[in-house]
């Protein structure tokens, strides 16, 4: 049954986030986000994602909503087969999470056009953010898959405070930061209030789009 996270849970801390990345085959004529946008005028250009309702699917829908571009989306069941088809030239572009695609990017089997994070991914320093693309509508565009720590709504405040302090301390450990970075994830410790505010922003951004498009997770 549906639930309201505001009444069912208490946010403790944001943990980490991983951005999306737009990738194309190495020989693709698409070099920039502007090139990609130019192909989104009539809705015929195909873009792969890793499944209906996934963050990658939502990411490309948000890009279209922000810019007015339209694409034909091919919903795979996971990234693996989409990667193979992209590398083989069966699909001309894919939106995926950086951590899923980076091996193929580093191996030269696919080329990254832009990432959806607020700043460039350290492992891909030459790949611009979508905000840097100069494309109208993407000036402030960011969208990432993220995880946070939550507790039941009735957890006593003093325990909530202890859990937050422990998480913030853990995520400040250089070894933990490095481990997440090795997985192309950025550690993002926060206060409970900051995590709640982030969820609120995401909900206002994503839920109307999901309802408008009738997206249902499969």
Ranges and model annotations:
Residues 18, 74-84, 88, 97-100, ...:
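Short helix-initiation/N-cap motifs at beta->coil->alpha
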Residues 1-81, 130-132, 146-179:
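Hinge/capping helix and adjacent helix->loop/strand transition within the periplasmic-binding protein
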Residues 1-10, 69-70, 104-115, 122-135, ...:
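Ligand-binding "clamshell"
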Residues 106, 157-218:
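An extracytoplasmic/periplasmic, membrane-proximal ligand-sensing/linker region
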């Amino acid at each position: 049954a549906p639930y309201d996270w505001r009444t069912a849970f208490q946010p403790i801390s944001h943990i980490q986030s991983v951005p999306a990345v737009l990738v194309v085959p190495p020989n693709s004529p698409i070099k920039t986000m502007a090139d990609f946008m130019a192909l989104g005028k009539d809705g015929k250009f195909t873009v792969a994602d890793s499944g209906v309702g996934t963050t990658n699917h939502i990411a490309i829908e948000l890009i279209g909503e922000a810019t007015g571009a339209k694409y034909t989306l091919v919903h795979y069941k996971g990234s693996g087969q989409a990667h193979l088809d992209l590398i083989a030239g069966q699909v001309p572009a894919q939106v995926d999470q950086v951590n899923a695609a980076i091996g193929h990017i580093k191996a030269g089997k696919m080329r990254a056009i832009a990432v959806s994070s607020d700043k460039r991914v350290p492992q891909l320093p030459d790949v611009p953010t979508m905000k840097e693309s100069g494309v109208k509508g993407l000036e402030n565009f960011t969208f990432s898959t993220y995880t946070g720590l939550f507790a039941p709504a009735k957890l006593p405040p003093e325990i909530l405070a202890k859990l937050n302090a422990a998480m913030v301390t853990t995520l400040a450990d250089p070894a933990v930061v490095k481990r997440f970075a090795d997985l192309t994830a950025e550690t993002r410790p926060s206060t409970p209030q900051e995590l709640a505010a982030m969820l609120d922003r995401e909900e206002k951004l994503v839920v109307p789009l999901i309802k408008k498009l009738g997206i249902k997770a499969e």
